Amino acid sequence: MDMMLLVQGACCSNQWLAAVLLSLCCLLPSCLPAGQSVDFPWAAVDNMMVRKGDTAVLRCYLEDGASKGAWLNRSSIIFAGGDKWSVDPRVSISTLNKRDYSLQIQNVDVTDDGPYTCSVQTQHTPRTMQVHLTVQVPPKIYDISNDMTVNEGTNVTLTCLATGKPEPSISWRHISPSAKPFENGQYLDIYGITRDQAGEYECSAENDVSFPDVRKVKVVVNFAPTIQEIKSGTVTPGRSGLIRCEGAGVPPPAFEWYKGEKKLFNGQQGIIIQNFSTRSILTVTNVTQEHFGNYTCVAANKLGTTNASLPLNPPSTAQYGITGSADVLFSCWYLVLTLSSFTSIFYLKNAILQ
């Protein structure tokens, strides 16, 4: 009661600033004796959420032109009436009209988060309004696993850490047609990784404040080479012939060719060898009898070696369209001779009749 009389006396003597400070002191727990509190009528509490970087306007209104106001942030005085106590250039008082005493904070940051109190000193009793400002922060991935190369069968852990307010949720996605969804979380564990699980993994952090933050990790899976196919086309003496060997492996395998036990080299005896990352083509520019035989394609990388063989044989009677046993061949020639005989008799008959 003595405090209220002192405040009113200060107001009556036009020392309103002292009155405001005394009323603010009543709002601060540090100014009160232990175990005591002061409850003001017409007090209100509001919550306000603002995205980081935006402008926050904390509303407060004076009852009439004679009343005075003040703004506090925790125990720090920001404004007392029209006097600015804060050195922060981002804060100001809104002056849309005589009753408006709203606090404006430009380019809000996480350090602005917290409670704010507007105290209005009238001729009768002080009125307070409290606003809790929550600064929302868009998600930001600040740490993610580097691109990596591992061997098939290895256990792999991918890491994706992000900040934001509210705390962002983390989700993973394997960028591939046959991808399966993963459980959400900062860490993605892949046990016994296979070659099909190689590729890019996308980490997405989102909290509905702004667009998700997305980063990617590339995972290369090494595996020993395999030969998927080896085949040749029709081989005719005097013409070109080729054998194609299709393989796979990471790192890409190196290809070699052998005829029997003998290694073949590019340019040797009319042989051309073309090697690609997943294919090797052996071409014989002018096939002769000595080129026929068994050819072996060998694919090797640092994880292993594999091979496949294919015989290169001379053309058979099949290429002329006549196949079968001796009896079948005899029947075919008998049919041709019989048709020839009938044709000769027909022409002889016509000659006699004429």
UniProtKB/Swiss-Prot annotation:
S-S bonds: C60-C118, C160-C203, C245-C297
Gene it is expressed from: NEGR1
Organism domain of life: Eukaryota
GO CC, alphabetical: dendrite; extracellular region; neuronal cell body; plasma membrane; postsynaptic density; side of membrane
Residue list for modification Phosphotyrosine: Y187
Protein name: Neuronal growth regulator 1
Keywords: Cell adhesion, Cell membrane, Disulfide bond, Glycoprotein, GPI-anchor, Immunoglobulin domain, Lipoprotein, Membrane, Phosphoprotein, Repeat, Signal
Record lipid sites (GPI-anchor amidated glycine): G324
